[in-house]
């Protein structure tokens, strides 16, 4: 027994109890409860959380490094594609300028050729930037897949032991509530849980230290990687700009003394079909605006047509009125009142209108002569009555002087044209009508001659002759 270690049965029973199924189930229960509390975001013990503040800061830095390295890798890939596209477009522009320069034999053609060569050279030198970028991308991917992945595994194990440790703390807190040191009640159970807490804390502290060290090393290695790779890229970029600027400066020196040109850059190229569509759209809008400005649509009964019809009707009515006046005037001339006939101007009353009629043309003379014959037959002839009239009253009244104008001059006759047109007849009738309307009413005729004519039959019929003593009245009175 001297060469062997001896353990009491109490310790052996305790060791066997720790390995029992019940102990494992209790341990898993509290670990699961802690994981559930963390997943649901429930509030934990503030002292336990404060003890892991430095670890949480390191974890935050680790997640930042992981995220930024992923973004950097994507940006490098996109930057390489953009450089390739830019070099391709620059090369195409250089070729285009060279081809146009060969066709142009002026100084502008030489300038385009030189500029095209410079652009082609610049595009080739720009592709040299892809080498350090490709190397940079490979280093970043290696850093992500090696250093960050290893640190991530360590962090995951540390999180597992931290959950186990905090679960053991919850278990010990629950057992301590039933502990009674005076009665030694639950003492063995409390000691067993306390031992489990110490073991979990030991494992957790070890992994906590590993995580902090790896995160610090990861940050430093990332700084070294960026400084090394960016220095290579910076050197290549400086060489590229140096060569390009030297080439451009040489071309600029060769262009001195050339006549400057003013170039207009087209911002966008329009398709001919698009121009046609825009032109048609402008025409349509112009038509719509013109229709909007145009007057309202015509009414069912046009006022202008009605006005024209009324004016035509008035014209026809005026013509008919004048014609009726003309006919009426001829009739009235021949069949006037008896007072005018007895006024001493029977021939003038009948022959007056015919004397003022214009002489028609050769084609209408027959009609005019026929009308004159008709009118003359209807009037009083110079028969016995005319001769008797002249014997009694005399021939002075038939030879009246022509009417004088306002200034003592005779009334000028209207100039009769050689034609006998309807328009001239209408004008003549209008003038006669106006003259007849403007003439004042004639004074009452002297009826003495009339009473003298019938004095033989009735001497007392003339009241004006009563009391007169001249020879004529004495003869009548006798």
Swiss-Prot record:
Give the principal location in a single coarse category: cytoplasm
Q: Domain named AH: which ranges?
A: 50-253
- Pfam families attached to this UniProt entry: Arfaptin, ICA69
Q: Where is the composition biased (Basic and acidic residues)?
A: 306-317
What tissue specificity does the UniProt entry give?
Predominantly expressed in brain, pancreas and stomach mucosa. High expression also found in stomach muscle and testis.
What SUPFAM superfamilies would the database entry show?
Answer: BAR/IMD domain-like (SSF103657)
Its topology with respect to the membrane?
Answer: Peripheral membrane protein
Q: Which Gene3D superfamilies match?
A: Arfaptin homology (AH) domain/BAR domain
Keyword Lipid biosynthesis tagged = no
Question: Where does the record place the region Disordered?
Answer: 306-365, 398-422
Might you report a single GO cellular component term? secretory granule membrane
Q: Summarize what gene deletion causes.
A: 129/SvJ mice lacking Ica1 do not display an obvious phenotype and age normally, while NOD mice without Ica1 develop diabetes and display sudden mid-life lethality but are resistant to cyclophosphamide-induced disease acceleration.
Q: Which keywords appear in this protein's UniProt record, sorted alphabetically? A: Cytoplasm, Cytoplasmic vesicle, Golgi apparatus, Membrane, Neurotransmitter transport, Synapse, Transport
Quote the SMART domains the UniProt record gives: Arfaptin, ICA69
Its annotated compartments are:
Cytoplasm, Cytosol; Golgi apparatus membrane; Cytoplasmic vesicle, Secretory vesicle membrane; Cytoplasmic vesicle, Secretory vesicle, Synaptic vesicle membrane
BP-aspect Gene Ontology terms: neurotransmitter transport; regulation of neurotransmitter secretion
Protein name (Swiss-Prot/TrEMBL): Islet cell autoantigen 1
């Amino acid at each position: 027994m001297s060469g062997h270690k001896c353990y009491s049965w109490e310790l052996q029973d305790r060791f066997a109890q720790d390995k029992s199924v019940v102990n494992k189930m209790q341990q898993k229960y509290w670990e699961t409860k802690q994981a559930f509390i963390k997943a649901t975001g429930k509030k934990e013990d503030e002292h336990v959380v404060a003890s892991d503040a430095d670890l949480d800061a390191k974890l935050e830095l680790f997640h930042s490094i992981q995220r930024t390295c992923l973004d950097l890798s994507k940006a490098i890939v996109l930057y390489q594609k953009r450089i390739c596209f830019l070099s391709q477009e620059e090369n195409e522009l250089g070729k285009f300028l060279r081809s146009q320069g060969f066709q142009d034999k002026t100084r502008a053609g030489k300038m385009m050729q030189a500029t095209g060569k410079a652009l082609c050279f610049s595009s080739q030198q720009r592709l040299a930037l892809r080498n350090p970028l490709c190397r940079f991308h490979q280093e970043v991917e290696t850093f992500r897949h090696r250093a960050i992945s290893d640190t991530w595994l360590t962090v995951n194990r540390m999180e597992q032991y931290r959950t186990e440790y905090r679960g053991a703390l919850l278990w010990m807190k629950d057992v301590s509530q039933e502990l009674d040191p005076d009665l030694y009640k639950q003492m063995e159970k409390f000691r067993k849980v306390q031992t489990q807490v110490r073991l979990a804390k030991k494992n957790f502290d070890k992994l906590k230290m590993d995580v902090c060290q790896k995160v610090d090393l990861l940050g430093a290695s990332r700084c070294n990687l960026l400084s090394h790779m960016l220095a290579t890229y910076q050197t290549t970029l400086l060489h590229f700009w140096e060569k390009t600027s030297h080439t451009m400066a040489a071309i600029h020196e060769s262009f001195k003394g050339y006549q400057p040109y003013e170039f207009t850059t087209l911002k966008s190229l329009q398709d001919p079909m698009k121009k046609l569509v825009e032109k048609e759209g402008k025409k349509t809008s112009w038509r719509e605006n013109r229709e909007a400005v145009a007057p309202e649509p015509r009414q069912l009964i046009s006022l202008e047509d009605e006005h024209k019809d009324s004016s035509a009707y008035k014209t026809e009515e005026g013509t008919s009125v004048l014609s009726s006046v003309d006919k009426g005037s001829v009739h009235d001339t021949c069949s006037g009142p008896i007072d005018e006939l007895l006024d001493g101007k029977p021939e003038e009353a009948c022959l007056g209108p015919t004397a003022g009629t214009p002489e028609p043309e050769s084609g209408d003379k027959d009609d005019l002569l026929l009308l004159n014959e008709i009118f003359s037959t209807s009037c009083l002839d110079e028969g016995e009555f005319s001769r008797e009239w002249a014997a009694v009253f005399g021939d002075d009244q038939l030879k009246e002087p022509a009417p004088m104008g306002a200034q003592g001059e005779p009334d000028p006759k209207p100039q009769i044209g050689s034609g006998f047109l309807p328009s001239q007849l209408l004008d003549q009738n209008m003038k006669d009508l106006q003259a007849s309307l403007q003439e004042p009413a004639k004074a009452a005729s002297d009826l003495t001659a009339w009473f003298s004519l019938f004095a033989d039959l009735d001497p007392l019929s003339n009241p004006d002759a009563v009391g007169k003593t001249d020879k004529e009245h004495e003869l009548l009175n006798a």
